[in-house]
Amino acid sequence: MRKLLLLIAASLLGVGLYAQSAKIKLDAPTTRTTCTNNSFKQFDASFSFNEVELTKVETKGGTFASVSIPGAFPTGEVGSPEVPAVRKLIAVPVGATPVVRVKSFTEQVYSLNQYGSEKLMPHQPSMSKSDDPEKVPFVYNAAAYARKGFVGQELTQVEMLGTMRGVRIAALTINPVQYDVVANQLKVRNNIEIEVSFQGADEVATQRLYDASFSPYFETAYKQLFNRDVYTDHGDLYNTPVRMLVVAGAKFKEALKPWLTWKAQKGFYLDVHYTDEAEVGTTNASIKAFIHKKYNDGLAASAAPVFLALVGDTDVISGEKGKKTKKVTDLYYSAVDGDYFPEMYTFRMSASSPEELTNIIDKVLMYEKATMPDKSYLEKALLIAGADSYWNPKIGQQTIKYAVQYYYNQDHGYTDVYSYPKAPYTGCYSHLNTGVGFANYTAHGSETSWADPSLTATQVKALTNKDKYFLAIGNCCVTAQFDYPQPCFGEVMTRVKEKGAYAYIGSSPNSYWGEDYYWSVGANAVFGVQPTFEGTSMGSYDATFLEDSYNTVNSIMWAGNLAATHAGNIGNITHIGAHYYWEAYHVLGDGSVMPYRAMPKTNTYTLPASLPQNQASYSIQASAGSYVAISKDGVLYGTGVANASGVATVNMTKQITENGNYDVVITRSNYLPVIKQIQAGEPSPYQPVSNLTATTQGQKVTLKWDAPSAKKAEASREVKRIGDGLFVTIEPANDVRANEAKVVLAADNVWGDNTGYQFLLDADHNTFGSVIPATGPLFTGTASSNLYSANFEYLIPANADPVVTTQNIIVTGQGEVVIPGGVYDYCITNPEPASGKMWIAGDGGNQPARYDDFTFEAGKKYTFTMRRAGMGDGTDMEVEDDSPASYTYTVYRDGTKIQEGLTATTFEEDGVAAGNHEYCVEVKYTAGVSPKVCKDVTVEGSNEFAPVQNLTGSAVGQKVTLKWDAPNGTPNPNPNPNPGTTTLSESFENGIPASWKTIDADGDGHGWKPGNAPGIAGYNSNGCVYSESFGLGGIGVLTPDNYLITPALDLPNGGKLTFWVCAQDANYASEHYAVYASSTGNDASNFTNALLEETITAKGVRSPEAIRGRIQGTWRQKTVDLPAGTKYVAFRHFQSTDMFYIDLDEVEIKANGKRADFTETFESSTHGEAPAEWTTIDADGDGQDWLCLSSGQLDWLTAHGGTNVVASFSWNGMALNPDNYLISKDVTGATKVKYYYAVNDGFPGDHYAVMISKTGTNAGDFTVVFEETPNGINKGGARFGLSTEANGAKPQSVWIERTVDLPAGTKYVAFRHYNCSDLNYILLDDIQFTMGGSPTPTDYTYTVYRDGTKIKEGLTETTFEEDGVATGNHEYCVEVKYTAGVSPKVCVNVTINPTQFNPVKNLKAQPDGGDVVLKWEAPSGKRGELLNEDFEGDAIPTGWTALDADGDGNNWDITLNEFTRGERHVLSPLRASNVAISYSSLLQGQEYLPLTPNNFLITPKVEGAKKITYKVGSPGLPQWSHDHYALCISKSGTAAADFEVIFEETMTYTQGGANLTREKDLPAGTKYVAFRHYNCTDVLGIMIDDVVITGEGEGPSYTYTVYRDGTKIQEGLTETTYRDAGMSAQSHEYCVEVKYAAGVSPKVCVDYIPDGVADVTAQKPYTLTVVGKTITVTCQGEAMIYDMNGRRLAAGRNTVVYTAQGGYYAVMVVVDGKSYVEKLAIK
């Protein structure tokens, strides 16, 4: 109905509380309710109360007292004295009658007169929100107030209420208080012990009914039952799929399809029916009968629907008139058992047309799939307690404050909570447009509006919250009355297109003040007092934030209705009743949606790479409690729920029988959905990683995983033909012993004549050159029968014999032999019967078919595959690691490979862009790769960090040079307002570090301790620290005062502390703690002022007395600003008792990067001298400059603060024309400057300016940002200088304050005194700089990537060079790394010409006396390319010379591949891009002028050159194809006269244009090569491209450069040895590179380790232990572990652990610059 806005004084209503109260202490230490010994037969319960509170109230009937007990509710007959009672909802087994036996209690009488209390007030009926308070009578039963003696209910009462989703519900009421109204006395029965037995209970039927009806989606409701623990041991808990019955109007069939498809993908088994089906029908009776039958049939089959979706308005599904409300209700479609408790979650997607239904569905799909472009709106909420002069201060405000205090706050992830507990409400609904995830209004309403503040249906239609859809709850009258003649408020809210809500919870009839209050916060004792979590039952707010529950829109409504049921009374009409509220409240929209609570979490999951066919189930890893579904094309195949270990067994109701892509959807309350596709097919034989996890910290992503199982993935033998005559074998790889190798010979009828191969191995390796000839066949004709057995210990096949016609050969297939690892001679033979020869296979493959002294390494498999090679044959050898670790890991982000070759089971990537990313890890084996295992990661924030600008890249030879401009073109673009560096980060994974301090201030022997999972799990980790207020193992109650103190910190500018905290038990959560900072010491007395102090509250499930530690509380992140100078931080656990543990984890402290603001007072400067630490410039050169003045020296001077100022004069005994600069020190990062100035009031016009410089301190570096000419009295009179006295007059003006904003990039500030003369002075004092971001260039650094791999970080310069880059195209990228994140990468492509710069070979380092001698072999004998030029730049390449010998101004140039010169069309057939060209005619206007070119194009120096190849071309038309050129060489210089012709030609036309490749030998001594264009005129031009010059090795065409520990120590060497004098005693890394004329080779490096060191008599500054094969080095420095080949195996600081194989190792430790080396033998 339409509501009136009532503004009525409280005195006009029945009662009005005011703050006069008293508390009566009872005979119990605490108020507590417990349920124990719970079973299907009985349970025990105890109730104790520690106080009764009396509050004086004024009513229309007089003054009374209200009595309350925490956790109890007001009861009584209307008009009779009101007393509190405790009410619990209990589960009753099938067939049982609950019987209560009181075992014991205490009883005490209290005289209220002693407390000055009035009579207890009469109990009043509930008030509808539609009632006019003026007309509500105050009910007073005079007879009840004349009755003598104690009056009250029986101590215990039980009432059966009905059956709710398979559980019979009863109300257990405890009435602890009786009242003698005449004597004004209370009788309180306390410490009540009872036993509730279930007589006639049928346990089997109870369990059967529960099993048949159970769904995890009803846990929210089950958790409100007092004795719920009897149902927790449910074996099939995670095998129950979600089922939904859908009944829809026939007109919605098409519009409903996308929603049905999604629900099936999500894992809902759908049973969909329409009203045009005969069994459904169109009447209310037929639809209800159909639904009831469906539910009962489903219950009988243990497949009862969880949800009932009604689709359409009342024209297709009418609903019916409520028995209690007399308004339309859908309750009885789902209340199947004949009572008022529903069996299904019911919601109505009310739409009058398919278009309106589509509007609802579109919003639901975006919300559930989380595809909204900006999810940040989910972190915002709107809470409104509407206007009502009486009830708003008694109920409305308390409701909203409860929500904010416990849930809608920063601790729960909300960034903005728009709370309006009372007027004014200005602009409150504007937040719906900007975006909120939740909106709640409680007060008055009408069928089409929230009343005050008013939001009408028309205004809802004008909302603009596109893509920001929310859940709305209206605790008010009639806003969900869906049979109203026009769409009701809730219908409009859900039906509007691209705006409004995806679901609305509201009441169809009038709602009631008290019941709506209970509905929201839970049933509680008294109005007008702020409710507490502990003093209320579970309400809808509490249920919304239950952890690990399937919280849906429907379950929120159920929780509210159960709270109203909880508060209901027995045997009286005090309240409107629970039945009314179950009829009243409805969900419009999709009630099966699980609302997000602020920003949803990211699910941790692992998907199989494929789904094998015909399996009954699949295992999928996901966060515990996740619901996992597999479907295809909208058809659901199977579902499962992830158990506590995070494994979901997806049971398939429809098996996969076809290949294709199948949808996998993972959902969980308050988690982002996972929506993926998996290919169905045969499983991969290659095992993937397991237990992949992904965590984020800022923009850093960390992946961790477990290695594949020890049994290697190549588990079955497989033979694959991969080409004609090419055969590959894959087989198990871990089937040899540690000292063995496997040799495999494979072939596929290579010659097509069934002649195959044999493999002969000589373990003595002494047959090569004799039995095995270096060339030619093994033998011809007949060989000795014992040739093989006498010389070859191992054969493939095992029965191979020396007969050319033998069948004991490998023709097609493979053979193998296992041999001891070691050195062998071998050969692979091939018989040729026609010639009688036993050939040794040719060398056409990648491995010789005969070998002298080949090493077969233990633990490896060698596969020799025979193949045709032209007219001959050959072998390709593939080597596999035969150990279980013969694989590496490859990491992908968003489908792109970002790292490969990993051997560790962890990976970190910093600077990841904000947003959602998919990371995948695959295992790369020798013979194949595993399926990818993937994880979704959400990186918070936005890419707001400025990138570099104007990045360029160039290459000369193999050297790449990058150049760029700083971000935003400024030296300090850091967008982070509070940058800093991490000073401390501790996760307590290895306990409490020794550098931390603990203080047990209460001395009970129980301080902070380390804890580990599973008992005490850390935040996203195993470890944390904890402190106890209750000890297990008989310790009992503790009163802790425990300090946990960080190591010493250096925070001159303060910092920011973040940490995670939680209660170890959510049911004993009230742990009190504080955070302190000390700038002095780390004793308890040094910590005085708390920066943060709070008591943890449970915010999770509540339960009766339980085993402590059973339900860990919710981890909450806290942030604390630390003051400047903080040296220590302390976490103090105190003022707590009888709870359990407080847990602490992930402590991180970041130092503020911001420089402290500072003020220059000039007090440290000297009178008459330039100010200290400032720079002055006397730009006018008159010898008068800025200087310090002291009021102690000049009596006319008054400083602004202190005694000193600075001054500049325009008159100082004489007229001056000043141009004086006063320049600050470096103030990079300053954003403002505030200062004070004064002038002579008599001569006030001294002009000055404030100037800034972004570069240096020269006068020309500064620009004006502010200037002024001061005003004054202009009264003339005395002027004053350094040598004058005031004589009593002080004409100095007052001090004037100015503040000037400084532009970004300001480095220096100057005060310039100029543009004035013959006045007097300007004074400055107290100059204050306000600093912004971090002031130094280390605000950010640059990171350089090549081809996706990070190659350099920490750069501060805007240039980078890399030498020795491999040939080919490369992508270079530069990103800016800020303290708070990284910028997007800016990239450029750079091409390195394919010139081969061969490195040295076989570098070795050996000691010789006190020296280190390096030896190496020269690069490969083929010198390789000395020059390779493709002219792809836009100018003549660097190093080349273009010589215009004829002097006409026309020379060689670079042109594109196709161009037009008038009518002379030129087409370059040489390449697809640029060429070098010289012209023989010149276009001027419309005519060509002839040229007579004599142009030289000269290469860089190419000493040692032997051969040149190039491409030469002429235009594509015959009449202009006769240009002449010559190839010339010089053995001296680059003048034209230095060159001699070695080849020349006149071009001739060929079809399509000339495209000629020339290859010419170059004479010995060639230094330069030139292309000379001459002896032609008036043709067009000559084009040259792709010039390659190679050398053979003579001549000094390269030199060697030697590096020690990264530093160049010698260059220009031509010998292949180098002696490093005096360096043999310490370990070093030596590298040698080859420097060619056009570039350098890659470095080749070796680690030198001395044989030993002198005995050290002093104690070694490290410890070295070997346990088994694990080497552990601990030191206060660096440690490195090497093998005897000098390869570094492990390195690190402080502690290095390495698991070795058998053999010898060297350990080097460097402490304080001194090296120590030890050798180890590992058996």
Swiss-Prot record:
EC number: 3.4.22.47
Propeptide: 25-228
Binding-site residues, Ca(2+) 4: D1000, D1002, D1004, H1006, N1042
Enzyme type, top EC level: hydrolase
Region annotated Disordered, chain positions: 964-985
pH effect summary: Optimum pH is 7.5. Activity remains high from pH 6.5 to 9.5. Loses 60% of its activity following incubation at pH 3.5 for 5 minutes.
Catalytic activity: Endopeptidase with strict specificity for lysyl bonds
InterPro entries (alphabetical): Caspase-like_dom_sf, Cleaved_adhesin, Gingipain, Gingipain_N_sf, Gingipain_propep_sf, Ig-like_fold, Pept_C25_gingipain_C, Peptidase_C25_Ig-like_domain
Annotated catalytic residues: H444, C477
Binding residues for Ca(2+) 2: D337, D339, F341, E343
Binding annotation for Ca(2+) 3: S987, E989, S1021, G1023, D1145, E1146
Known regulation of activity: Activated by the thiol-reducing agents cysteine, 2-mercaptoethanol and dithiothreitol. Inhibited by iodacetamide, iodoacetic acid, leupeptin, tosyl-L-lysine and tosyl-L-phenylalanine. Not inhibited by elastatinal, chymostatin, cystatins, alpha1-antichymotrypsin or the serine protease inhibitors phenylmethylsulfonyl fluoride and diisopropylfluorophosphate. Not inhibited by metal ion chelators. Inhibited by the heavy metal ions Fe(3+), Zn(2+), Cu(2+) and Mn(2+).
Binding residues annotated for Ca(2+) 5, in chain numbering: D1430, E1432, S1480, D1585
Feature type site, description Cleavage: R228, D229, R737, A738, R1155, A1156, K1290, P1291
GO BP of this protein: hemolysis in another organism; proteolysis; symbiont-mediated suppression of host anti-inflammatory cytokine signaling
Keyword Signal included in the entry's annotation: yes
Binding-site positions, Ca(2+) 6: D1444, D1446, D1448, N1450, N1495
Binding sites annotated in the UniProt record for Ca(2+) 1: D313, F482, E491
One GO MF term attached to the UniProt entry: calcium ion binding
Thermal dependence, as annotated: Only retains 40% of activity after incubation at 60 degrees Celsius for 10 minutes.
CC terms in the record's Gene Ontology section: extracellular region
Keyword field: Calcium, Hydrolase, Metal-binding, Protease, Secreted, Signal, Thiol protease, Virulence, Zymogen
Protein task: Cysteine proteinase with a strong preference for substrates with Lys in the P1 position. Hydrolyzes bovine hemoglobin, bovine serum albumin, casein, human placental type I collagen and human IgA and IgG. Disrupts the functions of polymorphonuclear leukocytes. May act as a virulence factor in the development of peridontal disease. Involved in the coaggregation of P.gingivalis with other oral bacteria.
NCBIfam families associated with the record: choice_anch_J
Assigned protein family: Belongs to the peptidase C25 family.
Protein name, as recorded: Lys-gingipain
Organism listed in the record: Porphyromonas gingivalis (strain ATCC 33277 / DSM 20709 / CIP 103683 / JCM 12257 / NCTC 11834 / 2561)
Gene: kgp
